[in-house]
Amino acid sequence: HRGEYLYVAEGRGGFRVYDIANIANKSISERIVRAPFSPLGHNAHVGSKQATCFAIGTTQPVHPPKNTRFMQEVNQEQSMHPLFSYAFVTDAEEGLIVVNINTFGDGDPLNNFLERALTWNENGLLDGARFISLYGSFAYIVADQGLITLNIDNPLRPVVTSVIQLAGMRSFATQFRYLFYTSETGLGVVDITDPSQPILVKDSAVALADARKLYLARTYAYVAAGEDGLAIINIEKPEAPVLDQMFDGEGQLKDTSDIVIGTTNASLFGYVADGDFGFKLLQLTSPSSQPNFYGYSPQPKPEVIGWMPSKSRVLS
C-alpha cells in the first residue's frame, strides 16, 4: 500500500486501488472501500485481462510533482526519479501495464481517476508475466521465458537489458547483491551486482518439490513449500545456500503458499498463507525456544502458535 490506499492486482478484475484511510477506525463499519463516495466521482480501477502482480517504487505517500526546482535548490532536496509516479502491473496476457498513480498523492479528492499510461509486451516477451519487483531503476519480471530485466529509467519507454531462461520460475526476492528465486525445481540464486545484467549462479540450487513464494530475513530464506510446509534455508553464503530445516508443524502446514517475517519486541514471527487451510502464525525465535535470540541472526526454532480458518484459499 501507499499512504491511505491499498493497491491490488485482481486477476480478471484488473488493477484496483482501495481506500483504507479508516482501516483502524472502530466507528466505521466498512473500512476497505472502492470509493469514499459515489463512483461517478472516483474510479480507481484499470481493467486488464489477467493482472497478476504489481510494484511501486515506495510505500511512502510521495507526490513527485511537488518536488519542484525550488525545493531542490532552497531545501536542497534531491530530484525524484520519474518511476515514483507509476505503478508497474504485470498481466499474464498483456505483459506490462504502467499506470500513473500521482492522483492519490495530490490531496485533491475530485480527480481520482486512473488510466493506462503504457501497455508493453514486445514480441510476446512478457507472456505469462506473474511477478515483478523493482531494483533501483530496473524491473525484474518473472514470465514464461524466465527472468526478464527491464531498464525503466524512462518508465514509459522500457528497455530490455537481459533475459535469463529459467523454466518454471515462480517468484523471487532480492538482498544486497543477490536475487533468490523459486521455481518448479526449488531455490536458486542470481548475481545482480550489475543490475542490468544478472548472472545465474551455477551449482547454487536447493532442491524443493513445490517451492512457491519466499521471504529473506538476514541470513535465512524462508520458502513456502506447499504440502511440505516451510523450508528454512541458510543463505549466509549466498552463492552456496544450504537447507537448514523443513517445518510443517507436525502436519499443520499443508498448503503453504507464502510467508512474511516480522519482529515484535525480541521475538521473530512468521505470517503464513496456508492455502486451503487458512492463516497460520509461527513464532520463530523466543527466549524459551532459542537462548541466542538476541543474536544478529539466530537459528530459527519455529512453532505454530496461532491460526485462523478462511472461507477461501489464502494465497498471500
State what each model feature region is:
Residues 1-316:
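Feature marking well-ordered beta-strand scaffolds used for ligand recognition
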